[in-house]
Design a protein with these regions (language model features):
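Cleavable N-terminal export/targeting peptides
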Residues: 1-48, 265-267
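Short glycine/proline- and aromatic-enriched beta-strand/turn motifs that initiate or cap beta-hairpins
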Residues: 36-83, 263-267
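Gram-negative (and chloroplast) outer-membrane scaffold detector with strong preference
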Residues: 42-52, 86-180, 216-218, 259-267
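Residues that define the transmembrane beta-barrel architecture of outer-membrane proteins
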Residues: 50-52, 74-78, 133-137, 153, ...
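Flexible, solvent-exposed coil segments and beta strand-coil junctions
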Residues: 59-65, 115-125, 182-193, 236-242
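Extracellular loop and loop/strand-boundary signature of outer-membrane beta-barrel proteins
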Residues: 66-70, 124-130, 193-198, 243-250
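Long, hydrophobic/aromatic N-terminal blocks
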Residues: 72-88, 92, 97, 187-190
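Predominantly the C-terminal beta-signal and adjacent terminal strand-loop region
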Residues: 203, 211-267
Length: 267
C-alpha cells in the first residue's frame, strides 16, 4: 500500500503545483495583455492640440508698384512682427498679425517744365530714378487650412487681407539733367526725400500664401512663411511718370514676402 500512497501523494502534489503554475502563467499573460493594450491606447491618443499659438517672424520683401504706369521697377525691404494663431476646428485656424512692413517700388519720372514756357535748367528738365519705401504698420488677418500630411510636418495654405498705415515714406533718387543748358554738361545728383504727404496714409491689401511649421526643440516650432500681398487700394493717386497734370493714374504696391520665425503653443 505504501507505493500506492506515494503515487497518490505525488499525483496530488503535481496537481497542486500544476494548478499554481497554470494560475501564475494565466495571470502573467493577462497582465501582459493589459499592459500591451495600454501602450497601444497611449500611442493612439494624440496630445491635445493647443488652441492658441504665438510667434515672432521676420524676413525680406520684394516690392513693385502696379503696372498702371509703364515706368516702374522693384526694390527690397524688411518685414518683422508678431503673430497669434487660434485653432478653430480641426485643420482650420485664424491668424492675426502685427508687423512693421516695408513696401513700395521703383519709379522712373521724366520732368520737362519747358513745355510750360519755363527756361531749361537742371530743375525744370531732368530724369529721376526713385526707390520708394512705404514704411507701414501692417495688420494682416488670415484664414489658414493645415494640410494633414504628417504629425510633425504641418504645411498650411492661407488667404486674407491686411490694413496698412503708412507712417513714413522715403524716396531715394538719382536725378540726371543738363547742369548748364547749351554746354551739354550732364550731371547726376543722388539724394533722399521724405514724401509721406504725397502717398495715402491708409491702404488695404489682399494676401495669399503658404507656411510650414517644423519641430525645432521642446515645444518650439520653426516657421517658414511665403506670401504675396497685392494692393487693393492705391498707394499713390494721380501719379504721372511725365509729371503731366491730367494724365495720372492710381498705383498700388505689391509685395512678395519670405519670412522665418519661431512658434510657441499656449495652453
Amino acid at each position: 500500500m505504501r507505493p500506492l500512497n506515494s503515487t497518490l501523494q505525488f499525483i496530488a502534489i503535481f496537481k497542486l503545483y500544476a494548478v499554481r503554475i497554470f494560475s501564475f502563467v494565466t495571470l502573467f499573460l493577462l497582465l501582459n495583455t493589459i499592459h500591451a493594450q495600454g501602450q497601444i491606447d497611449t500611442a493612439n491618443v494624440q496630445a491635445p492640440i493647443s488652441k492658441f499659438e504665438i510667434g515672432v517672424a521676420g524676413g525680406l520683401t520684394v516690392n513693385k508698384f502696379s503696372s498702371g504706369q509703364p515706368q516702374t521697377g522693384t526694390n527690397t525691404g524688411y518685414d518683422a512682427g508678431l503673430l497669434l494663431t487660434y485653432n478653430v476646428y480641426k485643420q482650420w485656424s485664424i491668424q492675426l498679425e502685427a508687423s512693421f512692413t516695408q513696401q513700395g517700388g521703383q519709379l522712373l519720372t521724366f520732368k520737362d517744365d519747358t513745355r510750360y514756357g519755363l527756361p531749361e535748367s537742371f530743375t525744370t528738365k531732368n530724369v529721376k530714378n526713385s526707390s520708394v519705401h512705404l514704411n507701414s504698420l501692417n495688420i494682416p488677418l488670415l484664414l489658414r487650412y493645415t494640410i494633414p500630411i504628417k504629425k510633425d510636418w504641418k504645411p498650411a495654405l492661407y488667404i486674407g487681407g491686411s490694413y496698412a498705415y503708412n507712417f513714413n515714406v522715403i524716396e531715394r533718387y538719382q536725378k540726371t539733367g543738363n547742369l548748364l543748358p547749351g554746354e551739354d554738361i550732364i550731371t547726376t545728383v543722388t539724394d533722399s526725400e521724405n514724401v509721406t504727404s504725397r502717398y495715402n496714409r491708409d491702404r488695404l491689401n489682399l494676401i495669399v500664401g503658404a507656411d510650414l511649421r517644423l519641430p525645432l526643440f521642446s515645444n518650439v516650432k520653426l516657421l517658414l512663411d511665403f506670401r504675396y500681398m497685392a494692393g487693393a487700394t492705391p498707394a499713390y493717386e494721380n501719379y504721372s511718370y511725365m509729371e503731366k497734370i491730367g494724365f495720372g493714374s492710381e498705383i498700388k504696391s505689391n509685395s512678395f514676402i519670405a519670412k522665418l520665425g519661431l512658434i510657441i503653443p499656449v495652453q
